[in-house]
Amino acid sequence: MIYPTSFDVIVVGGGHAGTEAALAAARMGCATLLLTHNIETLGQMSCNPSIGGIGKGHLVKEVDALGGAMALATDIGGIQFRTLNASKGPAVRATRAQADRILYKAAIREMLENQPNLTLFQQPVDDLLIEGDRVVGAITAIGITFRAKTVVLTAGTFLSGKIHVGLENYTGGRAGDQAASTLGERLRELNLPVGRLKTGTPPRIDGRSVDFSVMEEQPGDTPEPVFSYRGKRAMHPKQLPCWITHTNERTHDIIRSGFDRSPMFTGVIEGVGPRYCPSIEDKINRFADKDSHQVFLEPEGLTTHEFYPNGISTSLPFDIQLAAVRSIRGMENAHILRPGYAIEYDYFDPRGLKASLETKAIQGLFFAGQINGTTGYEEAAAQGLLAGLNAGLFAREQEAWCPRRDEAYLGVLVDDLITKGVSEPYRMFTSRAEFRLQLREDNADLRLTEMGRKLGVVGDEQWDAFCRKRDAVEAEKARLQATWLHPSKLADPAALARVLGKPIEREYTLQDLLKRPNVPYRELMTVPEAADGAPELADEVAEQVEIQVKYQGYINRQNEELARRDNLEDIRLPGDIDYGLVKGLSKEVQQKLNQQRPETLGQASRIQGITPAAVALLMVHLRRGFTDAKTA
């Protein structure tokens, strides 16, 4: 049957990408349908019970700045919060939280059910409805046809998913869930560039069978960081510690004894796994000289005894898993609640996508998450929000949007995917960004919330709070720049000397004094003349003022570097350009450009094998008027 209501946007899949996509499209006012194989698993954390980390926390903050759900759900469900790299510069500081799986999933479910313009429906999707070169709907397993202007596909590991434990394997999207095999076969028929990747998860442990007294306790930070710009510390539930132990030589010997039954080493698994989250057997094989590896026991929640042993992801046979776990200090009597496993699944070459995450081959079809070759909840959520937002814009026949590399880690993520592709699951690191001094966690809202408001994904309450913060930061910076301290006019010169480490000998602005190393804003405000006329600032405002003042010189230099670049990002390449007509390009370069069809000269310049000389030839070609290149 054809469902009686048509939609602007259909989102297929209810994981981290799908939920953000559906919420974003609905926030814009688009009639949105979220199709999931099981409403009970919306927002489920399929692997580790944590959100954030280096690079990943930056993405979560950006999703939050654009009105997304992940950071807020983490504040509601987070049972341990830490700031990583706290002693380093603000560019690489990152928030990480352990989450109670049940609380996190419940928070996401509540947001979905209470979001205007969003309809939920439980049915697996077996096919896409395509007319010509455009998607116009989705067809479920029981034959219901839903029509829509756009479809966002966020299938995670479900497309032709196969689960491996030792040499035993079976089809599945994750443990306990069926794979989307029919949809996987249908997508392969569309001649989209497809490959196989794999990921894995460790065995889960019953905490009652663990001796924590011989392990190192790892508490969260006090006071606890708050993840969301809309979050409050009062939202946080009871906090729990993690625990650290280590593998040993006996563990490694046990694991090596199972290599002959490992699906990874026997060639049973075709897919490539994540480089930065390797299985324990892969670590022992690659780093044979190491006699131990860290294992973090992470609590799964407040109402369960289940623990996630981060660091021992495995697809080895269960007898090897059990023996290896019980060889680890503190886990000699451990009871495994769920076996570890690997899962391999289909992904599609992201070089077949536009920057909006719309497929180049099929109009109105957007991909987000692991289907694009990424790994991680955070990377999925960021793509989901962008795809949902752009699906909404497409449905309204408006121009697509994607941040640039110098504007957001989301821009770095998308640009890396669509220009370089992936040969292994892609995860975000701060080192991937050239302009990371500007792309900090603390200023994600200042970078993106104004654009989010224009696009319709940021609500009134968030916008009002953002405006108050932005205005308070600017007002205090102006006061610091306009306020002068003269040594002869200080009531207590020693007070300022204690803050600065030495007395001043001439007149300085407060801005000049705050620029000095080891002079915190709050300490400077203990000097009466500095605090005169100062407003009472919230911590996040004071932090932003201090960072902007201290790093403005470095940021200015980075901005100059940006300005010196040729405006390659603004020069669009027509979709119908024939690179075979560009004089001077090698056959290899012509082939790569014709295959990948970059949207801008900037994208073209980052394709592997495209030289600066080739970019110069393209610019000459465009300037001669062979094609009509429009400035973005």
UniProtKB/Swiss-Prot annotation:
It comes from the Bacteria. InterPro entries: FAD/NAD-bd_sf, GIDA_C_N, MnmG, MnmG-rel, MnmG-rel_CS, MnmG_C, MnmG_C_subdom, MnmG_C_subdom_sf. The keyword Chloroplast does not apply. One of its GO terms (biological process) is tRNA wobble uridine modification. Transmembrane segments: none annotated. Pfam families: GIDA, GIDA_C_1st, SAM_GIDA_C. It is found in: Cytoplasm. FAD binds at residues 13-18. PROSITE patterns: GIDA_1 (PS01280), GIDA_2 (PS01281). Gene3D superfamilies: FAD/NAD(P)-binding domain, GidA associated domain, C-terminal subdomain, tRNA uridine 5-carboxymethylaminomethyl modification enzyme MnmG/GidA. GO terms for cellular component: cytosol. The keyword Cytoplasm applies. NAD(+) binds at residues 273-287. GO terms for molecular function: flavin adenine dinucleotide binding. NCBIfam families: mnmG_gidA. Homodimer. Heterotetramer of two MnmE and two MnmG subunits. This is tRNA uridine 5-carboxymethylaminomethyl modification enzyme MnmG. It comes from Chromobacterium violaceum (strain ATCC 12472 / DSM 30191 / JCM 1249 / CCUG 213 / NBRC 12614 / NCIMB 9131 / NCTC 9757 / MK).
